[in-house]
Amino acid sequence: MTIERTFSIIKPNAVAKNVIGAIIQRFESTGLTVVGAKMLQLTREQAEGFYAEHKGKPFFDSLVDFMISGPILVQVLEGEDAVRRNREIMGATNLANALAGTLRADYADSFTENAVHGSDSAESAAREIAYFFADGEVCTRIR
């Protein structure tokens, strides 16, 4: 197994529900470690830039509107197979397909308001981490 980093967002609906701690606890209880975190209020430009790959898709505008509707918590998670493990913890993007016990089954409100975002690959993780974190803002933790 490889130690890697992945990127995670706790989205506005989950922040509004005051479940940040519960979500972080799920990550940490499965061996992922938070090595970077920031609470942010995205601007429209930041949200559009982050989700640029979805520009032109039918859900793009509603996704951007949702992501700027309230604060978010962006974080870098580290651990063995962090990308895969985070995606398992989050559950399916579509709430209808999210298995019981996953973050989305527990906290999502809809397809768009699905509580969390996580990188889909190591390459995406590197790009997404760099979008929100400068050099020196992510720290390796002693285990």
From Swiss-Prot:
Key words, A-Z: ATP-binding, Cytoplasm, Kinase, Magnesium, Metal-binding, Nucleotide metabolism, Nucleotide-binding, Phosphoprotein, Transferase
Catalytic reaction(s) noted: a 2'-deoxyribonucleoside 5'-diphosphate + ATP = a 2'-deoxyribonucleoside 5'-triphosphate + ADP; a ribonucleoside 5'-diphosphate + ATP = a ribonucleoside 5'-triphosphate + ADP
Transmembrane segments: none
SUPFAM superfamilies xrefs: Nucleoside diphosphate kinase, NDK
Gene Ontology MF terms: ATP binding; metal ion binding; nucleoside diphosphate kinase activity
Record's subunit section: Homotetramer.
Protein name: Nucleoside diphosphate kinase
Protein's gene: ndk
